[in-house]
From Swiss-Prot:
CC annotations in GO: peroxisomal membrane; peroxisome
Role summary: Peroxisomal docking factor that anchors PEX1 and PEX6 to peroxisome membranes. PEX26 is therefore required for the formation of the PEX1-PEX6 AAA ATPase complex, a complex that mediates the extraction of the PEX5 receptor from peroxisomal membrane.
Xref: Pfam families: Pex26
Highest rank taxon of the organism: Eukaryota
Location of region: Disordered: 1-25
Keyword Metal-binding among record annotations: no
Name of the protein this chain belongs to: Peroxisome assembly protein 26
A molecular-function term among this protein's GO annotations: protein-containing complex binding
Membrane-side (Cytoplasmic) residue stretches: 1-246
InterPro entries per UniProt: Pex26
Record's subunit section: Interacts (via its cytoplasmic domain) with PEX6; interaction is direct and is ATP-dependent. Interacts with PEX1; interaction is indirect and is mediated via interaction with PEX6.
Length: 305
């Protein structure tokens, strides 16, 4: 029983001995309304799956932090609450397929990228790289990494490596990735060698793809040129066949007479002159050959019909 009495009295003892009736009772520190709203938002997100309500609750919590800041509240508590609100809000936006709004939604509360918490920035990188849009966070993460105040954080090295793997390498920014790894003291020697090896592998793959595309382009160009040269005789032959068929659609005697008159007008030779006989003979042979070719062509067309 004695031990029970001493045990029950232990919580009421202060630093200077047992609590006297004349001493005032110390009140618990006031709790920020944003903490209650954070718990409510997390409950809406995880339990009720009401993503819109969870996002709205996070926004009300942010307003509460801006309007009702408690002077006795530790600064670290406020930062943790803000980071947790961002995590819940990012998850709610992603669940509603509004992931494109995540970066702008976060920056409206932190104003500048350099002030983003490492955990929030890591979630943004993960989300946008998973949705194959890493370029959206390229400038934001670059600004955060270049800020001297962030380079002393313990999360800096892991976040820089995550940025290289998820953003710079997929975008082909190999020089920027190599400069970041070599110039940063946050990388250990082993991690630096591993990341540089990954950059070297990505550069080799990029060169192979570039050379392969050039080799594939050359046969296509050669094929197009040869196709043009092959199509030219076919075009000439089609024009010739069209002209011959049009010519022989007229009566043969009328065509012969028209050609003879044309020759007389152009060449201007005398049909009665002996010197004109070879020309007339060649002209007659030409028309016989044309007539024979046309008749054989018409015969082939009839067979096909």
């Amino acid at each position: 029983m004695k031990s029970d009495c001493s045990t029950s009295a232990a919580p009421f003892r202060g630093l200077g001995g047992p609590l006297r009736s004349s001493e005032p009772v110390r009140a618990a520190p006031a709790r920020s309304p944003a903490v209650d709203l954070l718990e409510e938002a997390a409950d809406l997100l995880v339990v009720h799956l009401d993503f819109r309500a969870a996002l709205e609750t996070c926004e009300r919590a942010w307003q509460s932090l801006a309007n009702h800041a408690l002077p006795e509240e530790p600064a670290g508590t406020s930062l943790e609450v803000k980071c947790s609100l961002c995590v819940v809000g990012i998850q709610a936006l992603a669940e509603m397929d509004r992931w494109q709004e995540v970066l702008s939604w976060v920056l409206q509360y932190y104003q500048v990228p350099e002030k983003l918490p490492p955990k929030v920035l890591e979630l943004c990188i993960l989300l946008y790289s998973k949705m194959q849009e890493p370029r959206a966070v390229l400038d934001v993460v670059g600004a955060w990494l270049q800020d001297p105040a962030n380079q002393d954080l313990p999360e800096y090295g892991a976040l820089a490596e995550f940025h290289v793997q998820r953003v710079l390498l997929p975008l082909g920014c190999l020089s920027e990735a190599e400069e970041l790894v070599v110039g940063s003291a946050a990388f250990g020697e082993e991690r630096r060698l591993d990341v540089l090896q990954a950059i070297h592998t990505a550069r080799q793959q990029q060169q192979q793809e570039h050379s392969g595309s050039e080799e594939a382009q050359k046969p296509n160009e050669e094929g197009s040129v040869s196709h043009k040269f092959l199509s030219l005789p076919m075009l000439v032959r089609q024009l010739w066949d069209s002209a011959v068929s049009h010519f022989f659609s007229l009566p043969f005697k009328k065509s012969l007479l028209a050609a003879l008159i044309l020759c007389l007008l152009v060449v201007r030779f005398d049909p009665a002159s002996p010197s004109s006989l070879p020309s007339l003979y060649k002209l007659a042979q030409l028309f016989r050959w044309i007539r024979k070719a046309a008749s054989s062509r018409l015969y082939q067309l009839r067979i096909r019909d």
